Amino acid sequence: MKGTPSFGKMNKTPTHVRCRRCGRNSFNARKGYCAACGFGRSKKIRRYSWQNKKVNGVRLV
């Protein structure tokens, strides 16, 4: 079977499970990498300058 009935089976298992490196629930079990820290994709921690922002709008380091 393909198409619309098959898409109903996609919500049985969780897409993201807890990451071993960052501890967040962002590790894609099927693809094998973390969306938050990049574990499984690279040795370096995934980090961007636009990630953190203070309440007054000033960006943190």
Swiss-Prot record:
The keyword Secreted does not apply. Belongs to the eukaryotic ribosomal protein eL37 family. InterPro entries: Ribosomal_eL37 (IPR001569), Ribosomal_eL37/eL43 (IPR011331), Ribosomal_eL37_CS (IPR018267), Ribosomal_zn-bd (IPR011332). Its cofactor is Zn(2+). GO terms for cellular component: cytosolic large ribosomal subunit. Binds to the 23S rRNA. Coiled coil: none annotated. Keywords: Metal-binding, Ribonucleoprotein, Ribosomal protein, RNA-binding, rRNA-binding, Zinc, Zinc-finger. Signal peptide: none annotated. Binds 1 zinc ion per subunit. GO terms for molecular function: rRNA binding; structural constituent of ribosome; zinc ion binding. PROSITE patterns: RIBOSOMAL_L37E. Transmembrane segments: none annotated. This is Large ribosomal subunit protein eL37. Pfam families: Ribosomal_L37e (PF01907). One of its GO terms (biological process) is translation. Zn(2+) binds at residues 19, 22, 34, 37. A zinc finger (C4-type) spans 19-37. The gene is rpl37e. The keyword RNA-binding applies. HAMAP family: Ribosomal_eL37.
